């Protein structure tokens, strides 16, 4: 769920507030359209697409689905006791948090004009 995703981001990018990722580029945060502005925004586009795939599992609601995972020294592991939906959502969030850690953060892409830049 979103609370767990926030904590995964804190695990892989402890130097930044997770809020920094809640309104970034065209895809980080609510919705998503147009061309991603950079690598970090591409991480969010992939995450959005991953959630769309997870939603194809019967009764799977990625934003609310809780799952079992572990954070140890910046390394995320999804636990084996997750059902198909939980495993899928956990992996979406894990891969996005790892992607965030490897992508440069450009302050100019925070809280951008979506209408102007994300067509």
Swiss-Prot record:
One of its GO terms (cellular component) is extracellular region. It comes from the Eukaryota. CDD domains: PLA2c. GO terms for molecular function: calcium ion binding; calcium-dependent phospholipase A2 activity; phospholipid binding. Binds 1 Ca(2+) ion per subunit. Keywords: Calcium, Disulfide bond, Hydrolase, Lipid degradation, Lipid metabolism, Metal-binding, Secreted. The active site is at residues 47, 93. This is Acidic phospholipase A2 2. It catalyses: a 1,2-diacyl-sn-glycero-3-phosphocholine + H2O = a 1-acyl-sn-glycero-3-phosphocholine + a fatty acid + H(+). SUPFAM superfamilies: Phospholipase A2, PLA2. Disulfide bonds join 11-71, 26-118, 28-44, 43-99, 50-92, 60-85, 78-90. Homotrimer. Its main location: secreted.
């Amino acid at each position: 769920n979103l609370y767990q995703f926030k904590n995964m981001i804190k695990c892989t990018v402890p130097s930044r507030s997770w809020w920094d990722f809640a309104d970034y580029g065209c895809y980080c945060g609510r919705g998503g359209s147009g061309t991603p502005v950079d690598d970090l925004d591409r991480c969010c586009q992939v995450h959005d697409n991953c959630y769309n795939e997870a939603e194809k599992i019967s009764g799977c609601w990625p934003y609310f689905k809780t799952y079992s995972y572990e954070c140890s020294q910046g390394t995320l592991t999804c636990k084996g006791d997750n059902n198909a939906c939980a495993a899928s959502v956990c992996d979406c969030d894990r891969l996005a948090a790892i992607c965030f850690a490897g992508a440069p953060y450009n302050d100019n892409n925070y809280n951008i004009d979506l209408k102007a830049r994300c067509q």
